[in-house]
Curated annotation (Swiss-Prot):
Mg(2+) binds at residues 277, 289. This is Formate-dependent phosphoribosylglycinamide formyltransferase. Pathway: Purine metabolism; IMP biosynthesis via de novo pathway; N(2)-formyl-N(1)-(5-phospho-D-ribosyl)glycinamide from N(1)-(5-phospho-D-ribosyl)glycinamide (formate route): step 1/1. NCBIfam families: PRK09288.1, purT. The gene is purT. Residues 123-318 form the ATP-grasp domain. GO terms for molecular function: ATP binding; magnesium ion binding; phosphoribosylglycinamide formyltransferase 2 activity; phosphoribosylglycinamide formyltransferase activity.
Length: 404
């Protein structure tokens, strides 16, 4: 396929085929962005009727950690691009697919391998690139974990090396928290059970996501790094509940944030969008994590930018020009399921959309859990404070209810 030169017609011999591995709410928006450019999209997830399944040309349900099943599906679908949207994937199979020239892996198979677990990316950032990070230690057993906690000191944060959206993450503040934190981490890890990272606390003023795009510069036809305006966010137990753009920060802190983001994404390589998470205190910045894909806090860009993070990702992976400029201050607020039930309904939608500048994305997940993210409210405003107030008001108006 001639990246950036030619796009085909979906469901025809000329089709440009993209396979997404992971079809949640972020994957769904990427699929929509790709389809607007006439791309044929295949959505893959571990459960049926995932949000992205509902809008893709074809949908598959497989265990993506099974290398044989993954390779067989890529071969059968003859995808030109394979785009991981989650961490729990057989990355060795992706490396084989890339090496054999079967498909291009986005951003690269190596980047996917490094970022699929917190150990790979932390060692790259801190030990190879020398980026400032929180103090950390890894542990494979409970005894080693207890020693790591003693080394780092209280308070500290414990995370499985393989998890997302705060699963298995907790704060250890005293000896009484040590064993419960280990058990919680063991239950929350997706794969590679038994290995955790223990991180020391960083005293920060705020957290940001620096969305960073590696895309083809139409003038030079070489890969160039682009930056979105910084996104501020609030997390509870490692899961984002609110985000806004732009996050006010000093010129020096912004410069340092973009330097860190540029260095880590350049080391990972490839094309696409990266969500670089950073801690900021005054002019000082610490690297936290990076995801080589759209970031959940970046849902705000559906309202704040002319090209959302999903459109930027679609364009970048296809070798097309990108424009990451801010259009307006905006905010997002999460809508949780509130109950454990399949096929729920939503009340209060009219009231939510009556909030000035507000919009909604209800993800269409087939099953709700009390703390599962089922939708998001978006809002624009004259400034970030107004946008945040509107987004929270719109989110609060939506009431998930039993459909029975």
């Amino acid at each position: 396929m001639q990246i950036g030169q030619r796009l085909g017609t979906p469901l025809s011999p000329s089709a440009t085929r993209v396979m997404l591995l992971g079809a949640g709410e972020l994957g769904k928006e990427v699929i929509i962005a790709l389809q607007r450019l006439g791309v044929e999209v295949i959505a893959v997830d571990r459960y049926p009727n995932a949000p992205g399944h509902q809008v893709a040309h074809r949908a598959h349900v497989i265990d993506m950690t099974d290398p044989d099943a993954l390779r067989a599906l890529v071969d059968a679908e003859r995808a030109h691009l394979v785009v991981p949207e989650i961490e729990a994937i057989a990355t060795d199979a992706l490396a084989e697919i890339e090496a054999a020239g079967v498909a291009e892996v986005i951003p690269t198979a190596r980047a996917t391998q490094l970022t699929m677990n917190r150990e790979g990316i932390r060692r790259l950032a801190a030990e190879e690139l020398g980026l400032p990070t929180s103090p950390y230690a890894f542990a494979q057993s409970f005894d080693a974990f207890r020693a790591a906690v003693a080394q780092i000191g209280f308070p500290c944060v414990v995370k499985p090396v393989m998890s997302s959206s705060g699963k298995g993450q907790s704060v250890v503040r005293s000896d009484a928290d040590v064993e419960p934190a280990w058990q919680y981490a063991m239950a929350g890890g997706r794969v590679n059970h038994g290995r955790v990272i223990v991180e020391g606390f960083v005293q920060f003023d705020y957290e940001i996501t620096q969305l960073t795009v590696r895309a083809i510069d139409p003038a030079s036809l070489k890969t160039r790094t682009y930056f979105c305006e910084p996104i501020g966010h609030v997390q509870v137990a490692g899961d984002y509940v609110e985000s806004w753009q732009p996050q006010p920060m000093s010129a020096k802190a912004l410069e340092r944030s973009r330097d860190i983001a540029h260095r880590v994404t350049s080391a990972l390589g490839g094309r696409g969008i990266f969500g670089v998470e950073l801690f900021v205190r005054g002019d000082d910045v610490w690297f936290s994590e990076v995801s080589p894909r759209p970031h959940d806090t970046g849902l705000v860009t559906l309202a704040s930018q002319r090209q959302s993070e999903f459109e930027l990702h679609a364009r970048a992976i296809l070798g097309l020009p990108v424009e990451p400029a801010l259009a307006t201050p905006a905010a997002s607020a999460v809508i949780y399921g509130g109950l454990d039930e399949a096929g729920i309904a939503f009340e209060g939608v009219r009231d939510a959309l009556a909030v000035p500048g507000a919009d909604l994305r209800l993800f269409g997940k087939p099953e709700s859990f009390a703390k599962r993210r089922m939708g998001v409210a978006l809002a624009t405003g004259a400034n970030v404070d107004e946008a945040r107030e509107r987004a929270k008001r719109a989110a609060a108006a939506v009431r998930p209810v039993s459909a029975r």
